[in-house]
Amino acid sequence: MAPQNQLGKRVKLTQVRRPFIVGSTAKPFSDTNPRPAGIPDNHTHSWQVFVKGLDDTDITYWLRRVQFKLHESIPNYVRMVEGEPGKPFTVEETGWGEFDITIKLYYVNDSGEKPQTLYHYLRLHPYGRNEEEKQAMISSNGEICSWSYEEQLFNEPYEVFYNLLTQGAIPKGWKPSGGKGKGKTRAPPPFPTDNNEVWEHSAMIPAHNRPGQPFSLETEAAEIRKLAEAQGQAEDMAKKILAELKAKEEQLATLKGENQAAAAAAKS
């Protein structure tokens, strides 16, 4: 972490967000995924856990290192992965059981931010409330994908880090140099209008889903619809229960009245 006096002041009333993905992918050993030599016989799957940018964009300009704390039965169970521009933070292993993985994020020195901790549950088998949800976890090549969309929020970042985060979005793989020689630079191309191409150094989210990219504005809209439908169902259930309660209260009042009338008649 850089000395605070070199980072400038905090940019007040400012929040910068950066989307990223935390997840794991597992695949059972088979003819198409043979068990490597030297792997114990009781290991049933190969798997990897990762932290990466949305649509595989580079996140090493704000994240420099990730620590993965695996199950203690795994040799060298605390793995430190240094950032390489353009590559995800990944650990690959084999095993037979599911467990919680502790993930610690270390930000670039210019951020002045302390590390933060996340948790991810390694899934080797599909899960869900029904078969449809379970099958949705299995990709076409038989992999079990357990991914979650996350957003890193930097609240009132230091000026140096704020300038780094907001230096401008660029297309993936774009280089400022236009050719050999000094002074030959080029400006980035026009910003995309369809929003289905995610640029580097941005908080962009693709407009539509595609293979290997389950998170998009389309996904968000589908989740909002599900929540709206669930809210509507909950409201209908509440109305039905209230109507039943009202009917039972009226029935109770009628029975009380009949009992009082019968008691009065018996006395007279």
From Swiss-Prot:
Coiled coil: which residue ranges? 220-268
Q: What is its main location?
A: cytoplasm
Checking Gene3D superfamilies in the record gives: YEATS domain
- Any single GO CC term annotated in Swiss-Prot or TrEMBL for this entry: nucleus
One Pfam family, short name please? YEATS
Q: Where is this region: Disordered?
A: 173-194
Tell me which UniProt keywords the record has, alphabetically.
Activator, Chromatin regulator, Coiled coil, Cytoplasm, DNA damage, DNA repair, Nucleus, Transcription, Transcription regulation
Q: Where does the YEATS domain start and stop, copy by copy?
A: 10-168
User: What InterPro entries does the entry give?
Assistant: YEAST_sf (IPR038704), YEATS (IPR005033), YEATS_dom (IPR055129)
PROSITE patterns cross-referenced by the UniProt entry: YEATS
Q: GO biological process annotations for this chain's record?
A: chromatin organization; DNA repair; regulation of DNA-templated transcription
Subcellular localization: Cytoplasm; Nucleus
> What job does this protein perform?
Component of the SWR1 complex which mediates the ATP-dependent exchange of histone H2A for the H2A variant HZT1 leading to transcriptional regulation of selected genes by chromatin remodeling. Component of the NuA4 histone acetyltransferase complex which is involved in transcriptional activation of selected genes principally by acetylation of nucleosomal histones H4 and H2A. The NuA4 complex is also involved in DNA repair. Yaf9 may also be required for viability in conditions in which the structural integrity of the spindle is compromised.
Q: Which family does it belong to?
A: Belongs to the YAF9 family.
Subunit structure of this chain's protein = Component of the SWR1 chromatin-remodeling complex and of the NuA4 histone acetyltransferase complex.
Comment field on protein domains: The coiled-coil domain is required for assembly into the NuA4 complex.
Protein name listed in UniProt = Protein AF-9 homolog
Which organism's genome codes for this protein?
Answer: Gibberella zeae (strain ATCC MYA-4620 / CBS 123657 / FGSC 9075 / NRRL 31084 / PH-1)
Q: What gene is behind this protein?
A: YAF9
